[in-house]
Amino acid sequence: MKRIQIIDSHTGGEPTRLVVSGFPSLGDGTMAERRDVLAREHDRYRTACILEPRGSDVLVGALLCDPVAPDAAAGVIFFNNSGYLGMCGHGTIGVVRTLHHMGRIAPGVHRIETPVGTVEATLHDDLSVSVRNVPAYRHAQGVALDVPGYGPVKGDIAWGGNWFFLISDHGQRVAGDNVAALTAYASAVREGLERAGITGANGGEIDHIELFADDPEHDSRSFVLCPGLAYDRSPCGTGTSAKLACLAADGKLAPGAVWRQASVIGSVFHASYERADGGIVPTIRGSAHLSAEATLLIEEDDPFGWGIGS
């Protein structure tokens, strides 16, 4: 029987499952190199943690790793039901909050290594977390697309740690009771991008679709469709970073000004940015709450031990 130790949290309603132990050794390379080893040789550990019967489509996994740099607090590899993520904002907030719960860090500034670079996270005295993300930028503005069943769509392509297609003029109602329609629309957009061969820089797959709408209490409300068909319950850290890159490029938000991004369920991130060569460096602040500590058990004769559909 195999055992995998986990600690679950949620950030603004979006769950993160931190894997503390039980995965095979991935070597001593960078987080990107270790992610590649995990994907190539041990992917069934991802599916065991994330897919049913132990997980769900909305769950994001985070494998805790020893960092390469001696001044880093931890390394982490993010994954979900469809594969691997370069970076995850809500997940980083959850990881930092959980590291404090484990007694590994105190309030202060900490460096976290990810497959797309090292991010700086500040654990505040109230246990909220600010994540200084990897650089973000807008790759293309006003990209036109024809989506069957919906007609013409125009959006921006931006990098915030993952690739996003951001749409403000979409005609959809961004609300928690309209998730099914939002999912269908965003999924059709993503399929349209793939059919048209539209990508991020260097052929990067645009696997996140982000829809924006006005919000009576905050600067914006968003719906984010993640890889697969799960939507982000949080405002999405990498998605908010991509949004800031577009706002900065359009001159609509000054460096240091706070942008309050609400999610489709009403949870909120506070975000700002500083300028950097070719783009911006965003900072996202939010809170995570602990929800479980558990040991996942994988019996040798369990036909679904490594996940349904794996």
Curated annotation (Swiss-Prot):
GO terms for molecular function: 4-hydroxyproline epimerase activity. It holds the Pfam family Pro_racemase. InterPro entries: Pro_racemase_fam. Substrate binds at G89, H90, H208, D232, G237, T238. Disulfide bonds: none annotated. The active site is at C88 (proton acceptor), C236 (proton donor). The keyword NAD does not apply. The keyword Isomerase applies. Keywords: Isomerase. It is an enzyme of class 5 (isomerase). It catalyses: trans-4-hydroxy-L-proline = cis-4-hydroxy-D-proline. Its EC number is 5.1.1.8. Belongs to the proline racemase family. Catalyzes the epimerization of trans-4-hydroxy-L-proline (t4LHyp) to cis-4-hydroxy-D-proline (c4DHyp). Is likely involved in a degradation pathway that converts t4LHyp to alpha-ketoglutarate. Displays no proline racemase activity. This is 4-hydroxyproline 2-epimerase.
